[in-house]
Amino acid sequence: MSAWVLPDHIADVLPSEARHIEELRRQLLDTARGYGYELVMPPLLEHLESLLSGTGEALDLQTFKLVDQLSGRSMGLRADTTPQVARIDAHLLNREGVARLCYCGPVLHTRPDRPHATREPLQFGAEIYGHAGLEADTEVLLLALDCLHASGLSDGVIVDLADARIVRALFAGVPVDAAVLARVHAALVAKDASELHALTRSFPAASRDGLRALVQLYGDASVLDEAAKALKGTPAVSAALAGLKQLAASLGADPARQISFDLADLRGYAYYSGMRFGIYVPGAADALVRGGRYDEVGAVFGRNRPAVGFSLDVRELVGVLPARPLRAAIRAPWSDAAGLREAIAGLRKAGEIVVCVLPGHGSEIDEFHCDRELVEHAGQWQVRAL
């Protein structure tokens, strides 16, 4: 095999895309900072038990594992940043009140999430710790939408809402082994009514009927009224439905944005403890942004604080945005002529891009559009349009 061939689903980022990614990274972090979120930078490598705290089997399977040559302990390359941020909140910051934290860095996956996906996403996220109320849920969702808007995505956005408490409440008190539970979850996600009917035949009536009803409970806000009738009698379900209705109302009416509900959406079921959302945009094969409430994530660190947040892959975000135009630049000769270096330094200090053409070469730069040049006229260096 050639030495230049990279592993499957791993790719270099070339100049034009790299510039776009970096500009978006800065825009996203600045948007989060505008909400009061503080930047943290956890390490890429960490002890395995910290990386897999309260995250379920899926993240375990996605994590690259190795042995530390210094200590002999099992370590992992992070597949998700949230457990690390939970550790920072619990033990390093150790604040009593609300902590707003954001991050942006690479994660590594053993397998791609879907066909053609990278195994090295650049994950951006924002999280609130310390507030259990719906206000925190609303803020992170509004921030996620503002991040997309800052990136240039505002039309055709679909916000899909669900709540993990609904399915948990329907399973409460039902003796079912892990294998059957996994099959029920798969049937709900696939909206497979016949499979779900067979699997729940022996369940108590309330759980059986409620789970079977879920496969039909998706669509616009009217779904919540239908769910209130079909799933009545469970306080946890009533609270979840009321929260979803209030959350949707908090977003307000926007003709460029659609709000939908899918009460059988169980992605991240082992991870989320309450409200969860996905944001879909034109051109993306799946949800571009995912988030929700995960109050149990800090339990392993001895400080189980309320937590809610979201994340997205910046590289995937770039893929659904139009290519950005080349940056305008000034072409300058490579020379020891008097005043040239001072003129170039002054232009760069003023924010201009100045590309010096090396002897024997023309302007071969793909990333910049040299629409001006620096020329000498009457003993002075001046910028002239090309």
Swiss-Prot record:
GO cellular component terms attached to this protein's record: cytoplasm
Protein origin, superkingdom: Bacteria
Entry keyword annotation includes Ubl conjugation: no
Location within or outside the cell: Cytoplasm
UniProt record, GO biological process: histidyl-tRNA aminoacylation; L-histidine biosynthetic process
Keywords: Amino-acid biosynthesis, Cytoplasm, Histidine biosynthesis
Pathway field: Amino-acid biosynthesis; L-histidine biosynthesis; L-histidine from 5-phospho-alpha-D-ribose 1-diphosphate: step 1/9
Keyword Amino-acid biosynthesis annotated: yes
Pfam families linked to this entry: tRNA-synt_His
Cystines in this chain: none
Major subcellular site: cytoplasm
SUPFAM superfamilies xrefs: Class II aaRS and biotin synthetases (SSF55681)
GO MF, one annotated term: histidine-tRNA ligase activity
Note: This function is generally fulfilled by the C-terminal part of HisG, which is missing in some bacteria such as this one.
Function: Required for the first step of histidine biosynthesis. May allow the feedback regulation of ATP phosphoribosyltransferase activity by histidine.
Subunit record text: Heteromultimer composed of HisG and HisZ subunits.
Family statement drawn from the similarity comment of this UniProt entry: Belongs to the class-II aminoacyl-tRNA synthetase family. HisZ subfamily.
Protein name: ATP phosphoribosyltransferase regulatory subunit
Organism name: Variovorax paradoxus (strain S110)
Taxonomic path: Bacteria, Pseudomonadati, Pseudomonadota, Betaproteobacteria, Burkholderiales
